[in-house]
Amino acid sequence: MKMIVGLGNIGTRYDETRHNTGFMVVDQLARDYHLGAFTHLKQEAVAVSGVINGEKVMLVKPTTFMNDSGRAVGPLVDYYDIDLDDLVIVNDDLDMPVGKVRLKTHGASGGHNGLKSIISVLGTKNFNRVKVGIDHPQHGTVVSHVLGKFSKEERPKFDQAVEQAEHALEDWINGEDFAKLMNAYN
């Protein structure tokens, strides 16, 4: 089974905010493949499972706050015996412009607290990621930026990035090597 974890903050107050980019990508996959509703798991997450192009896939959204994402991801990886090659984390990235998508097979957190938490709990930096750009704030604080919504001008670029992230994930689900996909999508 492949597991795709979208990072975000749970609660309607955070819906459609930049920091919930990961949630928005997995929500789009769930809608497009008619996987049904996300249900609560005991591992501090909501998830939906199904078959996408012949492959069993679980889409996950931690119900912890972003900074504690590892509390959900670690137990899920253990419980479902997920090989790290079969795990992808989808997260927002301040260091990339809105509309940009980048795939990585390993690396540091880049200052992303959700990734820091996952790295700490898993004990490794070696797991696949799909990073979606949300850009640095032009004005105001980083916190207000990541917890804010995309502007009318940004939204079409963001929607295109979600679609591109979804295509990359579909290619990976279909058996494409993640490292090779980096060349195609980065």
Swiss-Prot record:
Main location: cytoplasm
Binding site for tRNA: 14, 65, 67, 113
Reaction(s) the record says it catalyses: an N-acyl-L-alpha-aminoacyl-tRNA + H2O = an N-acyl-L-amino acid + a tRNA + H(+)
A single MF term (Gene Ontology): peptidyl-tRNA hydrolase activity
Residues annotated as catalytic: 19
Domain of life per record: Bacteria
GO biological process, one term: protein quality control for misfolded or incompletely synthesized proteins
Enzyme type, top EC level: hydrolase
Family: Belongs to the PTH family.
Function: Hydrolyzes ribosome-free peptidyl-tRNAs (with 1 or more amino acids incorporated), which drop off the ribosome during protein synthesis, or as a result of ribosome stalling.
Record gene name: pth
Site entry: Discriminates between blocked and unblocked aminoacyl-tRNA: 9
Name of this chain's protein: Peptidyl-tRNA hydrolase
CDD domains to which the protein is assigned, alphabetical: PTH
Keywords: Cytoplasm, Hydrolase, RNA-binding, tRNA-binding
InterPro entries the record matches: Pept_tRNA_hydro (IPR001328), Pept_tRNA_hydro_CS (IPR018171), Pept_tRNA_hydro_sf (IPR036416)
Keyword Cell cycle: no
Positions of the record's site feature: Stabilizes the basic form of H active site to accept a proton: 92
Source organism of this protein record: Limosilactobacillus reuteri (strain DSM 20016) (Lactobacillus reuteri)
One CC-aspect GO term: cytoplasm
Gene3D superfamilies: Peptidyl-tRNA hydrolase
EC identifiers of the protein: 3.1.1.29
